[in-house]
């Protein structure tokens, strides 16, 4: 079974087992809904945890797990990655993609010149920014907008872009 990252536990909060999460999902209100199951890998084993509570605090998602309502029971989870199973993913409408589908795609210009590979997706504001690792050059920051992203081909594992003035 495949698992996909939806967040990272960065710290505890208070003494009642609340965890501070950096979200890696566009759907935190759905992903971290009480009753949902999240998975955490620990020494090669995948453990499941049921969410008891969720709230947003500043730029973080705050959750507690059922049965782990004490700081001493969650201290060891700091730094762990939160994942969902493939079955938990919802179908997206055409033209929308999960981050794991985009990361790793090869990037080509419209005239078929290889530019690099997408290594990360940042969400700084109005639109996502794709970080493209280039060989022998600094990373390229691509705004994920229609003027730049011309075609996403998951079958061919590539993205066709138009390099607008000032992007390179």
Curated annotation (Swiss-Prot):
The keyword Cytoplasm applies. GO terms for molecular function: ribosome binding. Its main location: cytoplasm. GO terms for cellular component: cytoplasm; ribosome. Coiled coil: none annotated. One of its GO terms (biological process) is rRNA processing. Keywords: Chaperone, Cytoplasm, Ribosome biogenesis, rRNA processing. Gene3D superfamilies: PRC-barrel domain, RimM. The keyword Cytoplasm applies. Residues 94-167 form the PRC barrel domain. It is found in: Cytoplasm. An accessory protein needed during the final step in the assembly of 30S ribosomal subunit, possibly for assembly of the head region. Essential for efficient processing of 16S rRNA. May be needed both before and after RbfA during the maturation of 16S rRNA. It has affinity for free ribosomal 30S subunits but not for 70S ribosomes. The PRC barrel domain binds ribosomal protein uS19. Binds ribosomal protein uS19. Belongs to the RimM family. This is Ribosome maturation factor RimM. It comes from Ligilactobacillus salivarius (strain UCC118). The gene is rimM.
